[in-house]
Amino acid sequence: MKNARGALLAVLTVLGAAMTLATAANAADAILSGAITSAAGEKLGGVTVSAKPTGGTVTTTVFTDENGDYYFPPLPAGKYRVWAQAVSFATAKTEIELPAARKQGFVLNPMKDFVRQLPGNVMLSALPEETEQDKRMKRMVRNNCTGCHTPSYILQHRFDEAGWNAIIELMKNANVYGTFVGNDRKPAGILDYHQKELAAYLARARGPGEGAMKFKPDPRPSGESARVMFKEYEVPLDPDSGLPSNFVQNDGSDWSLGTPSVLIPGWGIHDAWLDLDGQLWFTCNIPNRRTTIGKIDTKTGELKLFKVAAPNGLAAQTHGMTRDDKGIIWFNVNNGRGGLGRLDPKTEKIDVYLPPQGMSPTGGATTVDHDGKGRIWASAPDGALRFDPVTETFTEFKSLTYKTPNGTGVTYGAAGDRDGNGWWAEMTLDIIGKGDDATGKSQEVKLAAVKEEMNRATPEARSFYETYNQPDFNNPLPWAQGPRRMGTDKKADVLWIGNSWGANLARIDTRTHETTYVPLPGEQQPYHVAVDTKHNAWTNLWGADRVLRYDPKTSTWTAFDLPTRGAEPRYVSLLEQEGAQTQVVLPYFRARKVAVMTLRSESDLQALKTKAGSQ
């Protein structure tokens, strides 16, 4: 069934004056390179070096090697701002013009107070945990103060006990979007219950004085992690906001300014994919009048906005997105009732399909995926929907457990496996639902509680928790796993789930339902999971400005740091094509950018070194 195929075609809006990187002949391109040392003369590896054309919207970033040398890919001629940064050093900046200035070195000077430079995972690790009470409060900060934002945003500031108490008072009356709902519902019970002791803990940890936090920055990137190259594409301010183009003074590019506020007026970037021709597409879940999804030309940075009209006169909002095996882009769309959008990148034509009345709409924290039989799966508030593109029909799968004394199992992530089954996460309840393709019925897998935290709870707190009803995803019990978004291995019988509170990836055998848990290093918190063609699981860390890759064959993790502080990515996707470098897409929800990370081999870097030496 398809509704209003013609009536709901996308209205294309093209933003004028989007930055265009010159499409000059390769002969005019230049390789920018240089060396970076400390003020003491030490060669610094793993330093982040970024270049952005004057007036442009695309930033290219590379890292120094073990000798302190860096090599950019060929860049078009023009004027650039170039800056280098590493935690505990002041940001070094300059302006150059290519191809005249092809060599640019930097000397980094130490920074005494570098806390604002730190990513959220380092902030969390620094919280005191000397006593059992400290550990309980640290868990409270980690689980209940990071659901809406990265911990670096709050912990970069200092407040006394009264100040922290005022913040908790506000946040216990805010929903998952950070919107004040104190007039519409009771305060979040877990924050209300622990408010006094939590404020005292935070004042001791991050108060006006010295504070009890012990900061230990992570090692800088090295090896493969230092060979990658990033392109970050900015999405401009919404012109309907009436603000000047230079309104945003901190977008996370200069770490010394700290983590930026999410209140950057613009089009919210949630999920993003590269199409098979290498162009970027992203979803917008922020109310606006102009865009439902957007397209970014990866060569020029030019932005096009596509609008599906909503009944209220705004653009229909969306959240989840996927690219199927044929290259078609699918996304959820709420144009009055949650449906599913289909876009062919070659024609830029959008069709919208709506579930029939009486069936649940797409909804929850909507995630979209495809299965091995070409069907599309999407989150529904109380389960998941499957859409067959051939027959244009929806099939509904309901969660077996939904309303409980401790909360409601609203769906978060969803995925389809190679056998045609669908999967979804009830984040509040630590339950994974399954839509069985063979029987047409729902099943469920219950995740194990974090026993260490369960044992740590006091008897008084346990008594409260027994009757505590979680109002949304982000007010969990201390022992919650918190399954957010997920991904299946399309070449194996494996489902990977990002357990945000449990700090692990749950691995479920899609046929036997056997479940195991793979801890993340340093108790870092996963969000979404994407699986590449080599069976590696990629997960974005929204609170760490990092993406991790897990190799199940060797049980090893590789970390790749993002160039933006406070990026807050909530999705990760991949483009793997024969004979081409693997590209990893990371949409920055907080910083309003889309990043594409390209994996570069040692031979790729050697070729750049050789060319740079012959310029």
Question: For the regions a protein language model found, what residue spans apply to each?
Answer:
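A short, solvent-exposed loop/turn motif at the edges and junctions
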Residues: 55-57, 79, 83-95
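Blade-level signature of beta-propeller repeat domains, shared across WD40, Kelch, NHL, RCC1
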Residues: 563, 567-615
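Short, acidic Ser/Thr/Gly-rich low-complexity loop/linker segments typical of extracellular
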Residues: 54-69
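Conserved beta-strand positions in repeat-built beta-propeller and related beta-rich domains
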Residues: 274-275, 282-287, 329-336, 376-382, ...
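The canonical Cys-X-X-Cys-His
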Residues: 141-152, 198
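Structural motif
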Residues: 35-44
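Extracellular beta-sheet/turn segments enriched in Thr/Pro/Gly and aliphatic residues
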Residues: 98-121
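Beta-rich, blade/repeat-based domains predominating
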Residues: 242-244, 263-276, 311-325, 358-373, ...
